[in-house]
Regions:
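Acidic, metal/ion-coordinating pockets
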Residues: 1-405
Length: 405
């Protein structure tokens, strides 16, 4: 198995640009899929925050181009059932199942179920979550007062009154899309937490259990940009909860990606959980086209060229991804599986050439020397809270595996 996250749509404008994108409206010519095969990849995730950049037309065109090439993918489909279904790869040593989900998304990109008398909706397999802010009585009263003064909940209150929406749970206070919950005791610590929506967690767990019956190993791919608090390198609680549930259901590994940088590695009950392995190919600055919405949103004319737009977005290379060295660092994990369990795990550090020219920046190469040591040391630090032991040895990282309850 050689896995990749396809954070791109592949078509020739068969879909119109969506009103909102994952950041850059991501589209390239379908022939680029042939390059992915030449790289040696054979199993792909397609559920991410760019899946819906070109609407349903972009989703279905990408699916068609993948299918025409016999490329095995999971995470998007013509219906929710298709998008959430495991994809199977046959190898000489056994069958691998892949399930793809994304938490970072535009609601319009979510796939829909087939009804009795209505068609399903093309899109991605979602992992939605609920954010809760636990506060004391004084701060809860402040939220109530803000809601009253600003009338920020007026539309929601109207929908509740007319029966189109459910009442707020007791002890909770929504405020413009945020959910505040009153602590049981005044001495309870105030905190923020997130939890996966039960409907999405249940659907994914059920598919893992089915895939476990049908395959020798099951891999779950999850695309998550969300973070805990303000630290982009720390995964949110709902992602940890989700990953543990996946392993409990039978997943051999969970591969996370999304924040464009490394996050910690956890060994949970003997299974590796990569909260983010970073980028591999990251050429976001050299897309051929962007819709007028992108330019107008920056206060630029609709006929602006892509290069000028990228200069404006990065303030001529002084802000954003370009100036953050961790965006241009990653690892390529390599492991051996026996009896459905990961037995040997090696991490190959990769650099994407932060200081290269725009045309070359984002292409991967194996890191060497001090650069390799720095990447592995960074990942080791991120993984320490999980008790994971990473040993740097001859330019690669070796992970000590063991059952960790």
């Amino acid at each position: 198995m050689r896995f990749a996250n396809l954070e791109m749509t592949f078509h020739r404008c068969e879909g119109s640009p969506a009103a909102a994108s994952g950041g850059t409206w991501a589209m390239t010519d379908p022939s680029m899929l042939d390059d992915m095969r030449r790289f040696g990849f054979n199993l792909y995730n397609t559920a991410n925050n760019h899946s819906g950049d070109f609407g349903e037309g972009g989703v279905t065109a990408t699916i068609r181009h993948l299918e025409e090439r016999g490329m095995i993918f999971a995470g998007t489909g013509r219906t929710l059932e298709d998008a959430s279904r495991a994809a199977y790869l046959e190898t000489r040593h056994g069958r691998v199942a892949l399930i793809g989900v994304a938490s970072t998304l535009d609601p319009a990109a979510i796939a829909g179920s087939q009804g009795v008398d209505m068609p399903g909706r093309p899109g991605l397999n979602p992992l939605r979550f609920r954010a809760i802010h636990h506060v004391n009585a004084r701060h809860f009263a402040m939220a109530e007062e803000l809601a009253r003064v600003t009338e920020v909940n007026a539309q929601k209150d109207y929908l509740i009154a007319t029966g189109y929406s459910s009442p707020y749970p007791e002890g909770t206070m929504p405020l413009g899309g945020m959910n505040f919950e009153l602590n049981d005791l005044e001495t309870d610590p105030e905190r923020n937490e997130t939890e996966p929506l039960a409907i999405d967690l249940k659907r994914t767990v059920a598919e893992i259990r089915e895939a476990k019956r049908q395959a020798d190993i099951v891999v779950v791919s999850v695309h998550t940009h969300e973070m805990k608090g303000r630290d982009t390198m720390v995964p949110p609680e709902f992602l940890e909860t989700f990953a543990h549930a996946c392993v409990d259901a039978g997943a051999s590994a969970v591969i996370g990606h999304g924040p464009h940088q490394l996050r910690g590695l956890e060994i949970y009950k003997g299974a590796p959980v990569f909260y983010s392995i970073g980028n591999f190919i990251f050429e976001t600055e050299t897309v051929a086209r962007q819709p007028a919405d992108a330019f107008i949103g920056k206060g630029m004319p609709a006929d602006t060229k892509v290069g000028a737009y990228m200069d404006a977005r990065s303030a001529n290379g002084t802000r954003g991804y370009i100036v953050d060295p961790h965006i241009w660092e990653a690892v390529v994990p390599e492991w051996i599986v026996a009896d459905g369990k990961v037995r040997d795990l090696v991490l190959h550090p990769v650099t994407l050439g932060q200081k290269d020219s725009r045309s070359q920046r984002g292409l991967p190469r194996l890191a060497e020397g001090d650069e390799a040591k720095a990447i592995l040391s960074h990942l080791k630090d991120l993984s320490e809270p999980y008790g994971t032991k990473i040993q740097a040895e001859n330019g690669v990282g070796r992970v000590k595996l063991g059952i960790k309850e």
